[in-house]
Amino acid sequence: MSDLLTKDEIVALEKSYWDAMKEKDGARTAALSGETSIVSGPRGVMSIDQAKMGKMTEEGNWTLQDYAFDDVQVSTPAPGVAIIAYKVKQTVTMDGQQKQMEAADMSTWLRGKDGWQCHAHSETMLGGQPLV
């Protein structure tokens, strides 16, 4: 992949990350994450290093069964920078309970010595869903 990605390439990167979560593939989520990534969502804001990201993927008390993107928006403001925002419908099991959730997500990808990696991700729950 070059320093300027097409919309399809950016979507493919993001889906690769989601597929790794679905497969509980911590090595892949770690490799696709920046050395330290900033994540924001219903539980607040945190910085997560690659090792912790991999561990959270493998050991988290959740399972992602399915997901679908909608209303995808992308921007490549500079060489080696890609931003993607989208709505995502996801089916997850948390604490033994299956849930359907809809959120608005955004990720910032940077191309570095290890290829394209996600350095920031945010998730906002939609539809007045409980912040569990």
PLM region descriptions:
Residues 1-31, 38-132:
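A beta-strand edge to alpha-helix "cap/lid" segment located at domain peripheries
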